[in-house]
Regions:
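The canonical Cys-X-X-Cys-His
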Residues: 36-43, 101
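Stable alpha-helical elements in mature extracytoplasmic
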Residues: 24, 28, 65, 69, ...
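Short hydrophobic/aromatic patches at helix-to-coil boundaries
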Residues: 104-108
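Axial heme c-ligation environment in periplasmic c-type cytochrome domains
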Residues: 48-59, 72-102
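Electrostatic cytochrome c docking/interface patches
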Residues: 16-32, 58-60
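Bacterial N-terminal signal peptides
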Residues: 7-15
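Positively charged n-region of N-terminal signal peptides that target proteins for export
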Residues: 1-4
Length: 108
């Protein structure tokens, strides 16, 4: 009985730990809208830049994806998804907003 109780407690702790780092999808999408990201990116489809689901698929399993994408969003870049460059978004988009948006994209 004690072992069962310990197992249930450990499972509950893991579930809560997973939720602590979870991104609020609605809030993140609202940040993307507010900061103009959705003018060039769709969630499920390409607009000017790639759709966010395509970005998530490309970086699935890449443990360095978050850092790479944050750097790309801040500095801008070209040649990865087509000929149209993405403009730099720093400093006019807050670092914490960029991080939240990137974390959300990677959950799609």
């Amino acid at each position: 009985m004690k072992a069962l109780l310990m197992t249930v407690a450990a499972a509950g702790s893991l579930m809560l730990a997973g939720q602590a780092g979870a991104v609020d999808a609605k809030a993140a999408e609202a940040l993307a809208q507010k900061n103009g990201c959705l003018a060039c990116h769709g969630v499920a489809n390409k607009v000017v830049g790639p759709g966010y689901k395509d970005v998530a698929a490309k970086y699935k399993g890449d443990k360095t994806a978050e850092a790479k994408l944050i750097a790309k969003v801040k500095a801008g870049g070209s040649g990865v998804w087509g000929p149209i460059p993405m403009p730099a978004n720093s400093p006019h988009v807050k670092d914490e907003d960029i991080k939240t948006i990137v974390q959300w994209i990677l959950t799609l």
